Amino acid sequence: MLASAALCWAVALLLQPLRGRLDTESVRHPIRLSDLRTTITAVLAVRELRYLSFACFAFNGTQAVFVAYFVTYMTSQGHPLVAAGSLYSTVIAVAVPGRILWAWVGGFYVAPHLVLGGLAFGMAVSIGLMGAFTPHWPLLAIGAVTMVVSATALSWHGIMLSEAARLAPPGRTGAVTGGVLSFGQIGALSSPAVFSLLLGLSGGYSAGWVVCAVPAVLVGVNMFRQGKPVQQRNAL
């Protein structure tokens, strides 16, 4: 914990020289509750941003469920806590280069909405497969499936934010990305609660993992149904 706190302080200090160039808004800029409603309404009014918002909801929800329940799920399957924790930390590491990779692919080679659609279907299949785990599955096979989860459900952030920023009109990048991310927070708060409810009702984890895959499938369908990428929005 102390090391994590020290790292936060180090990052804060390293960012200080950039404040003069990036933090140009006046500290007296008024913050109104109506700004939240305006931002959400503006995001929902544009089809591409609406799709991104739902994707952020589904992706962040899936991520939150995986992070919250994976280790407990493994121990319920009879795996030692140390082994479950070690596997978790290993597969989580895949997300670090994954976030950079997908943003790079979407920025230079493949349309961003197609990359997001591929990530959606990838996380739907892999998170659904987690419901099929049994105590007889070898850790190597479990690791292979969960690495796909990490490479999809935990690696979407870079391309999601870059696409939201690209679609935002000039001067509204912060508001638009914030609006999209707000739906992600709703997913992160609600999805683990739904998973917990299904766990209590069914007495097992399988139903929760399968249901968790459904929003991702819908996102994949939405993304692949889109046509050519639109240009930057001039107004919302």
Annotated model-derived regions:
Residues L18-S53:
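Juxtamembrane intracellular "pre-TM" segments in multi-pass secondary transporters
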Residues M74-T75, V105-G106, F195-G203:
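Interfacial helix-cap and linker-helix signal at transmembrane-aqueous boundaries
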Residues G98-A111:
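Helix-to-loop junctions at the C-terminal end of transmembrane segments
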